[in-house]
C-alpha cells in the first residue's frame, strides 16, 4: 500500500520488518529492490535484484532490471552482459535490443549499436529508436543516414518541437562521444 502511494522510504521500512519476520522471501526482496530503484538508489536496488535472481534464475524480468540498475550507474559493460542474457533467454526481445543498442552506443560501440537499432527498426520502432539510430549513424560518419533517421524520428514523434526536446536531452552525450559542439545546431537542422 505504501509503495503504491509512492511512499517508498516508508515502504522500505515496512518491507525490512517483513524480511526480519520472514527472511529471504523473494516477493519482499523484489519489492525492496523496486522501492530503492524508484528512489534512484540503484546500487542498493541492484543488490536486492541480484539476490532475487539467485532465488529465481529463470525469471526473465530480473536480467533487465539488473541491467537497468547497472546502466543507471554507467556500468555499461556489465549492463550489456545482462541485456545479452535477456536476449538469449527470449527470442526477438525488443526491450533487450533497445537496451543493448543504447549501452553499446554510450560505450562507443557504434557499429554494434547500429546492428541492434536496425533490428528494432525492422520490427516495431518508436520515435526514440529512430533518434538513437540516427545518433549511431552520425557517430559512424554517415550523415545522410543520420539525416534520414532524424527525419523519421521527427515524423514519428508528432512534431519538430518534440523531436528537438528529445535530441537536446542527448546533446551532452553526443558531445562526450565525439560530436563537435559547434556542429550540434547543424545536426539539429537535419531533421
Question: What do the predicted segments below correspond to?
Answer:
Residues 159-191:
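Terminal, low-structured helical/coil segments at or just beyond the last alpha-helical repeat
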Residues 122, 135-162, 188:
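TPR/TPR-like (Sel1-like) alpha-helical repeat modules
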